[in-house]
């Protein structure tokens, strides 16, 4: 697949969307691409569609602008991030039929290649890691890097899962060099979530 910048030529309006019950990688990749467009292609009118994004990711730039219900309009381009199949598309599912072009950027080996263009890297830790390789690194701002780092951290289990590779670490290092507050991101995006999950599990076991 070409770099995102090449694909955007001729695009005036586009939608960015993720899967049902979006996690950190889904939210991070969607908002990372959204921020990249705001920074480098402000002439493109872009909308992000996510189904009830979790509040622990509200620190991410662009979070408040996410649309949680679908506006059935015809976009020049619809980009699906971290969505392995058409059945997994969230609120944006109706947009595909009217889109001028559809692209899926994903890392799941189960991806069904349901879009016109499908860029899938099963060995990647996350959709954010895949997306990083499709962006012009020198054009990635700190807010964009913050979103991408969030996705990598959550889907790699803070670099503990087997999907973590040397390439994952190099991408994370490149994002850190953009100035991301990595300690806060790890705390907010991963450990706070884990703490809450443990509390819920504890209450369930007591009951």
Predicted feature residues:
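A structured phosphate/pyrophosphate-recognition subdomain
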Residues: 1-17, 32-38, 112-207
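Divalent metal-coordination and catalytic microenvironments
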Residues: 23, 33, 57, 79, ...
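Anionic-ligand anchoring segments at beta-strand to alpha-helix junctions in alpha/beta enzyme folds, i.e.
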Residues: 14-74
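Short, glycine/acidic-enriched loop or turn micro-motifs at the edges of active sites
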Residues: 22, 26, 83-85, 109, ...
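Conserved strand-to-helix beginnings and helix N-cap segments that scaffold or border functional pockets
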Residues: 27-31, 90, 165
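Active-site cofactor/cluster-binding pocket
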Residues: 61-117
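Generic beta-sheet signal
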Residues: 49-51, 81, 105-107, 122, ...
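Short, glycine- and charge-enriched coil/turn segments that flank and shape catalytic ligand pockets
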Residues: 42-45, 71-74, 98-101, 137-142
């Amino acid at each position: 697949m070409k770099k995102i910048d090449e694909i955007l030529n001729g695009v005036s309006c586009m939608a960015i969307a993720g899967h049902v019950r979006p996690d950190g990688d889904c939210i991070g990749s969607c908002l990372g691409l959204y921020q990249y467009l705001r920074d480098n292609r402000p002439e493109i009118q872009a909308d992000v569609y996510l189904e009830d994004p979790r509040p622990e990711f509200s620190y991410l730039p662009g979070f408040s602008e996410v649309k949680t219900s679908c506006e059935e309009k015809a976009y020049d381009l619809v980009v699906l991030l971290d969505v392995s199949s058409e059945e997994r598309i969230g609120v944006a599912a109706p947009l595909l039929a009217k889109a001028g072009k559809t692209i899926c950027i994903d890392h799941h080996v189960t991806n069904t290649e349901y879009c016109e263009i499908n860029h899938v890297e099963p060995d990647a830790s996350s959709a954010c890691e895949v997306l990083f390789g499709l962006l012009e690194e020198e054009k990635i701002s700190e807010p964009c890097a913050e979103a991408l780092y969030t996705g990598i951290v959550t889907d790699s289990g803070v670099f503990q899962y087997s999907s973590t590779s040397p390439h994952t670490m190099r991408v994370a290092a490149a994002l850190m060099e953009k100035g991301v507050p990595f300690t806060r991101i790890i705390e907010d995006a991963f450990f706070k979530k884990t703490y809450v999950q443990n509390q819920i599990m504890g209450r369930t076991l007591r009951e």
